Amino acid sequence: MLGTYRPFDTLPHAFFDAMTLMVAASLLLAIAAAARTIWLRARPTGATKPGVGQSPVSSSWADSLLLLAVAMSWYTVAVGWAAQLVCYPIYADMSAHGAQAFHAYSNGYLSRWPTAFAVPIGAMCLSWATLLWVPLRNVPRRLVWVIVGLCLAFAVVTPPAAIAQGHMFSEGFSQDQYARLMLWEDFRTAIFTLIGVLALVVMRRRLMSTESRSAVDLTKR
């Protein structure tokens, strides 16, 4: 058994498991944040209400987390569109060269996908979910909630696409399964793109806050 062990065979599974754990942690953070918000809003009228994401104190840690979230979001957008426009259409192209060629491509794609895509997706979801707990100056909390909702929507639409890929991997190319894969991939690409656009909106609002503070400091001199 030790003679046939190849450590790189387990690496894609490790990346995929890491993504699964990070997405699950994101869901738990979102549920906890929602429960916290409901509890705070249910408190008596005179009690402190949750803010809209404006912090009186600038947090370098929050800004670093935001940079990570935006970077991972746009990495995901780029890889998502590459899969949509290049990788998945090759399934149909390779099927014209026979079952062996199709299976070789399918195996190669599925074995490499987690290495390039899984951890960035998990990091994107986890960083945005964590930002629900870290106020960002001049960034409404509801905007972060929308992005977290889109991250969780990705988790919902991914299994049908994965099932279609799995059927083609085990049974060979099928036009019906391929159409199902592309349909759900359309949804995923739209979700990633929306996340990327909203990430830029969040970053712009945060930078506008920094510029406003700099202008105020200059007027005081």
What are these model-predicted stretches?
Residues 117-129, 191-196:
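Core segments of transmembrane alpha-helices
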Residues 146-170:
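Hydrophobic alpha-helical transmembrane segments of integral membrane proteins
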Residues 2-17, 34-46, 51, 55-120, ...:
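Interfacial loop at the N-terminal end of multi-pass membrane proteins
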Residues 38, 127-142:
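Juxtamembrane helix-break-helix junctions at the cytosolic face
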Residues 211-221:
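Short, highly charged, low-complexity non-transmembrane loops/tails of multi-pass membrane proteins
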Residues 169-201, 211:
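Alpha-helical transmembrane segments of multi-pass integral membrane proteins
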Residues 59-74, 136-152:
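Interfacial segments of alpha-helical transmembrane regions
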